[in-house]
């Protein structure tokens, strides 16, 4: 997932992507909610702008690499559907 963000940053001309991953507790101790926030920092702005948010749960049966692959697909889906067209 980090590699795809780096690759996208190599072709963006009007900004840089920043990825924030935040695990949060749930009511069930063995389950974590993982929040993913994708920001863009443009050359004209001093603060990043959130452009994509998605989340998933990590349960004892899940593998973190599966979650990473899923998150990568979410980012690619966003890009393919034109989510970054203003920053190319």
What are these language model-derived features?
Residues 53-88:
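Mixed-charge, Lys/Arg-enriched low-complexity segments
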Residues 17-23, 34-38, 71, 75-80:
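Extended low-polarity, hydrophobic cluster-rich segments
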Residues 18, 24, 46-47, 52, ...:
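Intrinsically disordered, low-complexity regions of eukaryotic proteins
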Residues 1-22:
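Negatively charged, low-complexity tracts enriched in Asp/Glu with abundant Ser/Thr
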Residues 26-66:
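Acidic, low-complexity, intrinsically disordered interaction modules
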Residues 1-7, 27, 47, 59-60, ...:
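Generic short amphipathic/hydrophobic targeting helices enriched at N-termini
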Residues 3, 9-10, 35, 62, ...:
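Detector for Asparagine
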């Amino acid at each position: 997932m980090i590699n795809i963000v780096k690759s996208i940053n190599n072709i963006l001309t009007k900004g840089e992507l920043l990825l924030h991953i935040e695990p949060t507790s749930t009511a069930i101790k063995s389950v974590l909610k993982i929040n993913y926030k994708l920001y863009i920092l443009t050359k004209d702005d001093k603060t990043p702008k959130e452009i994509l948010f998605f989340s998933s749960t990590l349960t004892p049966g899940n593998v973190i690499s599966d979650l990473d692959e899923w998150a990568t697909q979410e980012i690619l889906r966003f890009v393919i559907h034109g989510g970054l067209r203003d920053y190319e």
